[in-house]
C-alpha cells in the first residue's frame, strides 16, 4: 500500500525523474503477468496501467521541452543580430568626437582643387573638426583639407628616390602634331618620349632614315616654330651677318650641305665660311641625328661639350645647361668685325677703350686658335750641373748666374751622393760578407 500512495517520480523543471525502485517493481510486475496470463487474473493489468500512463506522460513532457528550447534560442539570436547591426551602422557613416558628438560622413564628392578631377574620396575629419574634412585625390595622389592649403608633395614621394631615372620623364608628352606623324606605332598621347637600354638602340638602328627626312620637311608646330632635331642630310647653319650699318641685327641664313652653300657664301662672305667650318667640326654641339620621333621642344644652343655625354645605352637624367658659361664663338679678323668694335657702334655691352687691351685680346684669341697649351717641362736630376743650366729656370724667373755663383742649387744632393759613394767604397768589403745587410743598407740609402 505504501508503494501505491508514494509518488513514483520527482518533477523538476517540468520533467519527471523516476526512482530505481520503480524500474525494479516494473520488472517484477512484467514477470508476474507472464506467469499469470494463462490463469486469467484481472488484477495484473490494473497494476500495470498506472505505470504505463506515467511513462507516457514523461515522454510527452520531454518532447514539449525539446520543442520549446529552439524557439528560445531563435529569439536570442535574433536580438543579438539586431544589436550588432545597430552598432555597426553608425560607425560606417559617423565619427565620434571626444565630447561624444557624432560627425556624419559627407556624401557629396568634391572636385580636386589642383587637377579638377572627380576621383576623390573623403578620408576623415582633421582634429575631429567638422569644418576641416580631409579629402584625397586619386588622380594626382594628394591630400587637401577644406579651408587649408594643399600638399604640394605627392604621397610616398620620399620612397621614390632610388628608382630609375626614366620615371622622372613622365611630364614630357607628345603633342597632337607629333602624334599624327609618329614613327613608332606604340607611342600614343601622354606617353614617354625617352627610352633607355638595348631595346632603344635596336629601334634606332632598325628605323629607316627616309621617314626622318619626311618628318623634317613636313612637320611644323601650330605656332610656326620648328621643334625637331636637325638631320645629317639637312643641317641648318645659322650665320650672323654683321654689317657696319647695323651690327646688332643678324640674319639667320639656312643652308644645306648640297644646294645653298654657294649662295650663302656669296651673301655673307668669309663670316659664313668660318662659322660653317666650326659648325661642321662641332656637329651641332656633339649631337648626332637620332632616328625616331623628333624632340617636342625648341633647340637650345647653350649645350655642354661632346665629352659631357655618356655612351648610348646608359640612362642619365637630362638637365639644362643654364649655369655653366659657354665660350664665345671665334671671331674672324675681318674689317667688318673691327668696325663693330668701335665705341660708337649701336651694340650693347662693354667696349674696349684702350688699344693695349684690344691687342691683348687679339693675342689671346690667336693663342686659342693656334691651340697652344702650356705643358710643364720635366727636369731630370741625373747631373746637377746640367739641371742648373736648364731653360726652365728662366721661365720660372730664376737667374742661373746666382745659382752658379752660390755653388748650384743641387750642391747638397751632389755632396750626399759623394758621401754615399765613399761609404759604399769603405764598407763594401765588410758588407759583402753579409748580403742581407748589404741589401738593407742599399734600401736605407735609397729611402734617404
Curated annotation (Swiss-Prot):
GO terms under cellular component: nucleus
Record's note on what induces expression: Circadian-regulation. Highly expressed at the beginning of the light period, then decreases, reaching a minimum between 16 and 29 hours after dawn before rising again at the end of the day.
Region (Disordered): 26-108, 243-269, 332-370
Molecular function in Gene Ontology: DNA binding; DNA-binding transcription factor activity; zinc ion binding
Keywords, in A-Z order: DNA-binding, Flowering, Metal-binding, Nucleus, Transcription, Transcription regulation, Zinc, Zinc-finger
Top-level taxon of origin: Eukaryota
Ranges of compositional bias, category Low complexity: 55-69
Loss of function: phenotype: No alteration in flowering time, probably due to the redundancy with CDF1, CDF2 and CDF5.
Biological processes per GO annotation: flower development; regulation of DNA-templated transcription
Ranges of Polar residues composition bias in the record: 80-99, 246-259, 332-347
InterPro entries, alphabetized: Dof, Znf_Dof
Compartment(s) of residence: Nucleus
Compositional bias ranges of the Basic and acidic residues kind: 40-54, 351-368
Tissue expression profile of the protein: Expressed in the vasculature of cotyledons and hypocotyls, leaves and roots.
PANTHER family documented for this protein: CYCLIC DOF FACTOR 2, CYCLIC DOF FACTOR 3
Functional summary from the UniProt entry: Transcription factor that binds specifically to a 5'-AA[AG]G-3' consensus core sequence. Regulates a photoperiodic flowering response. Transcriptional repressor of 'CONSTANS' expression.
Protein's recorded name: Cyclic dof factor 3
Species of the source: Arabidopsis thaliana
Recorded name of the encoding gene: CDF3
Amino acid at each position: 500500500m505504501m508503494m501505491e500512495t508514494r509518488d513514483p517520480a520527482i518533477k523538476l523543471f517540468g520533467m519527471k525523474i523516476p526512482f530505481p525502485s520503480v524500474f525494479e517493481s516494473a520488472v517484477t510486475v512484467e514477470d508476474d503477468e507472464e506467469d499469470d496470463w494463462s490463469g486469467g487474473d484481472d488484477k495484473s493489468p490494473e497494476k500495470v496501467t498506472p505505470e504505463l500512463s506515467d511513462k507516457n506522460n514523461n515522454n510527452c513532457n520531454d518532447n514539449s521541452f525539446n520543442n520549446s528550447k529552439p524557439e528560445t534560442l531563435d529569439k536570442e539570436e535574433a536580438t543579438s543580430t539586431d544589436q550588432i547591426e545597430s552598432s555597426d551602422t553608425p560607425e560606417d557613416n559617423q565619427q565620434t568626437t571626444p565630447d561624444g558628438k557624432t560627425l556624419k560622413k559627407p556624401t557629396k564628392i568634391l572636385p580636386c582643387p589642383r587637377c579638377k578631377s572627380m576621383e576623390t574620396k573623403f578620408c576623415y575629419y582633421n582634429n575631429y573638426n567638422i569644418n576641416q574634412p580631409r579629402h584625397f585625390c586619386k588622380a594626382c595622389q594628394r591630400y587637401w583639407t577644406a579651408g587649408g592649403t594643399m600638399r604640394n608633395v605627392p604621397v610616398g614621394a620620399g620612397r621614390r628616390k632610388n628608382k630609375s631615372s626614366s620615371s622622372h620623364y613622365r611630364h614630357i608628352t607628345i603633342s597632337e602634331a607629333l602624334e599624327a606623324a609618329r614613327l613608332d606605332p606604340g607611342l600614343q598621347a601622354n606617353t614617354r618620349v625617352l627610352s633607355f637600354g638595348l631595346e632603344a638602340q635596336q629601334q634606332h638602328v632598325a628605323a629607316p632614315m627616309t621617314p626622318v627626312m619626311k618628318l623634317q620637311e613636313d612637320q611644323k608646330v601650330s605656332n610656326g616654330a620648328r621643334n625637331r632635331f636637325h638631320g645629317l642630310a639637312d643641317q641648318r647653319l645659322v650665320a650672323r651677318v654683321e654689317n657696319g650699318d647695323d651690327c646688332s641685327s643678324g640674319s639667320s641664313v639656312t643652308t644645306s650641305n648640297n644646294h645653298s652653300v654657294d649662295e650663302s657664301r656669296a651673301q655673307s662672305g668669309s663670316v659664313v665660311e668660318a662659322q660653317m667650318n666650326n659648325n661642321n667640326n662641332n656637329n651641332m654641339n656633339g649631337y648626332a641625328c637620332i632616328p625616331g620621333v623628333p624632340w617636342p621642344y625648341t633647340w637650345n644652343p647653350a649645350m655642354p661639350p661632346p665629352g659631357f655625354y655618356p655612351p648610348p645605352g646608359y640612362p642619365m637624367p637630362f638637365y639644362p645647361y643654364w649655369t655653366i658659361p659657354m665660350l664665345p664663338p671665334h671671331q674672324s679678323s675681318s674689317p667688318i668685325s673691327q668696325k663693330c668694335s668701335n665705341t660708337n657702334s649701336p651694340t650693347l655691352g662693354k667696349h674696349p677703350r684702350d688699344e693695349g687691351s684690344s691687342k691683348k685680346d687679339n693675342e689671346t684669341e690667336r693663342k686659342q686658335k693656334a691651340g697652344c697649351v702650356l705643358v710643364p717641362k720635366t727636369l731630370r736630376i741625373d747631373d746637377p750641373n746640367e739641371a742648373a743650366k736648364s731653360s726652365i729656370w728662366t721661365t720660372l724667373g730664376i737667374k742661373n748666374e746666382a745659382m752658379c755663383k752660390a755653388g748650384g742649387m743641387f750642391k747638397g744632393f751632389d755632396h750626399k751622393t759623394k758621401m754615399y759613394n765613399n761609404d759604399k767604397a769603405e764598407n763594401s768589403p765588410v758588407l759583402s760578407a753579409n748580403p742581407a745587410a748589404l741589401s738593407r743598407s742599399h734600401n736605407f740609402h735609397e729611402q734617404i
